Amino acid sequence: MTRSLSIVIPAYDEEKRLPGTLERITGYLQSGEWTFSEVIVVDDGSCDGTVRVAEEFRADAPAVRILRNPGNRGKGYSVRHGMMEAKGEWTLFSDADLSSPIEELEKLWKAAQESRAQVAFGSRALDRSLIGVHQPLLRESAGKLFNVAVRVFTGMPFLDTQCGFKLFETKAAREIFRRQQLERFGFDVEVLFIARKLGYSSIEVPVRWNDMAGTKVGTVSGLSAFLDPLRVRMHQLKGKYR
């Protein structure tokens, strides 16, 4: 079976973490069975040396591509940018901190193939024994409350929409992401909602996960995110996902 893969890494001020992340991902890809693979780093207007270290790594790893946003647009914008440029038949987006180890991709791939799903996404909620390092209690509790809002406003049954480890059939991803409206925290909810609306099959998969220091989600943006499930519902009512 042909296995063609793109990996999108949204990056904002990831100068310190990015080299190790790229080393681990490219090493994994070289040892795997992918007939074609590429890694797309999407810089979101970083103020540090993110682009420089990505370019330095690319000098010895031509499979790495670098895209740059017009300023700081948000994680959702970055992921969409990468998804629309992906060349593989399947595209994974992964957080730059590899809070879900890249090796967990095999679980998503297997689940997608067995269920014939176009979307397979990592979940911390289906098997919490797979969480090595938990978030602080307040953040973890807020995440559970956020999921309640997601289920109430969108009607989706998923227990964790926010894990930054999602695999898409690229053909489906282009249809999903071109309809995306949210550019920051809540985009995960939105793209899963759009996928269901368009009739694509999505499967939630338990994956290993560790909380990593240096989160880019601040208190204000985190509170604002609680409105995103409502925004998704409003966009749906206005016909923006047609």
Which residues are covered by each model-predicted region?
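Donor nucleotide-sugar binding loop of glycosyltransferases
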Residues: 14-17, 46, 75, 101
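Short, well-formed alpha-helical segments that are part of the catalytic scaffolds
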Residues: 14-30
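Cell-envelope/extracellular polymer assembly enzymes that use nucleotide-activated donors
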Residues: 4-6, 38, 190
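Catalytic donor-sugar/metal-binding loop of nucleotide-sugar-dependent glycosyltransferases
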Residues: 156-157, 179-183, 192-209
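A conserved acidic beta->alpha catalytic loop
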Residues: 43-52, 98
